[in-house]
Amino acid sequence: MKLRGLLLGAAVALTMAPPALAERASDGNVSIIYWQAPSILNPYLSGGTKDIESSSLVIEPLGRYDQTGALVAYLAEDIPTVANGGVSADLTSITWTLKKGLKWSDGSPVTSADVKFTADYCMNPDMGCAQLAAFDGIESIKVVDDLTVTVNFDAPKPNPYGPFMGGQSPIIQKAQFENCVGAAAPGCTEQNFGPIGTGPFVVTEFRPNDVIQYKANDN
């Protein structure tokens, strides 16, 4: 069965959830019921688990941790390490390379400029970024080419996998958010409620603290 749609919302009648889920699954849709519905789909403006998990269906990081705690490449070609040359021997830089052919849900290409913008977006001092700790110690970020970006730290970083790892630190589209930086970020309702992403779903309707409706991402 190919999943065509997803509905996520707050639980109002838990006793009715199982038959409702079964019925949805039969026509290519699935419902996910949380104890409390998400309020925003931008994890850089919220540290809430419900918001991070909901947004992770749409926007994705360079890498994630699997159930065993191992690093797994996602939008990145592989996980940079000292052994493969992706992390410098002195632990002061890490170089990420995007997979070729990645597209945003609007059909435009994902590039290293989006990766750099994501970091600049969160690190803006007027932003109040909820995930700022993930970018701690970054001195500069250099775009090497369309698919490659190097993060330079201000001191050796034994664990350089804070930025762009996991649902708390996904890549956002520069073209969509470039006018939403700093103090302007919280006011960008359209972007924060319906981010353009690379994930399996696209938001079709979002009623904060009520329900989110998604459809499959054709790209």
Regions found by a protein language model. Give the residues of each.
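Gly/Pro-rich hinge or "lid" segments in bacterial periplasmic/extracellular proteins
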Residues: D66-A70, G166-N219
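Bacterial N-terminal signal peptides that target proteins for export
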Residues: M1-L7
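N-terminal lobe/hinge region of extracytoplasmic solute-binding protein
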Residues: I33-V87, D120, I196
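Bacterial N-terminal signal peptides
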Residues: G9-T15
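Surface-exposed binding/hinge segments that line
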Residues: L132-V181, P200, E205-R207
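Sec/Tat signal peptide C-region and signal peptidase I cleavage site
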Residues: P18-A22
